[in-house]
Amino acid sequence: MITDCHIHISPLEMFKPQALELMKKKRPNFEQIAEFCRSPKAFLKYLDVCGIDRAVLINYVAPEVIGFTNGVNQFIADYVKEDPKRLLSCGSLHPRHTTNVLADMEQILRLGIRMIKIHPP
């Protein structure tokens, strides 16, 4: 079984405008990436073409840099519902952007997120 352990599938609507523009400039295949971010089915087909069985989808809270709030956790929880055996969710908690770490962790668990990335302070 082949598992890609580091894929960023992100909510495009959360990107700060300047971060999104930079991504568009630096990624010649931006439209393909955007389609994968919008459509789990399209991303699963791409995994099939590449011979990848599963993918860990990593998001992270980074409001200052990219614009991502803790809403990325809900986004990825919803995204992986398309095929939870192949799409493995990795949520995020940023110590500087929470007032209650325990409550945020409990919410991540309620969403069914299977892994967590703790962004450094």
Go through each PLM region and give its residues:
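An N-terminally biased module of ancient metal coordination in phosphate/nucleic-acid-related enzymes
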Residues: 1-60
